[in-house]
Amino acid sequence: MADKSDLNALSGRFRGYYPVVIDVETAGFNAQSDALLEIAAVTLQMNKEGWLLPDETLHFHVEPFEGANLQPEALAFNGIDPTNPLRGAVSEHDALHAIFKAVRKGIKDKGCNRAIIVAHNANFDHSFVMAAAERASLKRNPFHPFATFDTAALSGLVLGQTVLAKACLAAGIPFDSSQAHSALYDTLQTAKLFCELVNRWKKLGGWPLPAAESG
């Protein structure tokens, strides 16, 4: 188990939180009524020198829950055909159960207390994950019920950009717009962006925190 006093350990960097990068693709903006169609998650790790890196990736196409709204505008935007059998979609329960299981293992292995969602405009992704978990009656949700790390806000501060593609490019991370609005691609790029922002702060001397002056 990791030592929470080790500032180069993941458990020591974010107050015991285990950050997991999430992106969802949906059939609308309402987490209660609109379908969750795709979800990806990237866990993170810290090396011995305290640099944050992407770790494991999980990705699922998701079947719309019974009675879910499918907004035509949203489907046209993300290009998803929920009826396409080649999607290999699974239920919300199966997708989130697999993600939650992997996240709980990561929390334990890294010596953390609880997971926290990292996402671009994080409130959107967080709301869909929480709503789907409730519909699926998944009781052991490892994620904080409201706290998130929002890479849109962090990018606005550090890079002067809030759009994911522009923030990635400003950070020196390639971004292929033709692959955008794929949950898998967006999650991978968001994970790279979050790691870059955290590591850049470390390079600038912002972490570990300077010891408080005595007297």
Swiss-Prot record:
What this protein needs as a cofactor is: Mg(2+)
List the Pfam families. Answer: RNase_T (PF00929)
Annotated ranges, domain Exonuclease = 20-194
Q: Which InterPro entries does this UniProt record tie to the protein?
A: Exonuclease_RNaseT/DNA_pol3, RNase_T, RNaseH-like_sf, RNaseH_sf
Catalytic residues of the enzyme: 181
Q: Which domain of life is it from?
A: Bacteria
E.C. designation(s): 3.1.13.-
What is the protein name for this chain?
A: Ribonuclease T
Native source organism of the sequence: Yersinia pestis
Q: Tell me the organism's taxonomic lineage.
A: Bacteria, Pseudomonadati, Pseudomonadota, Gammaproteobacteria, Enterobacterales
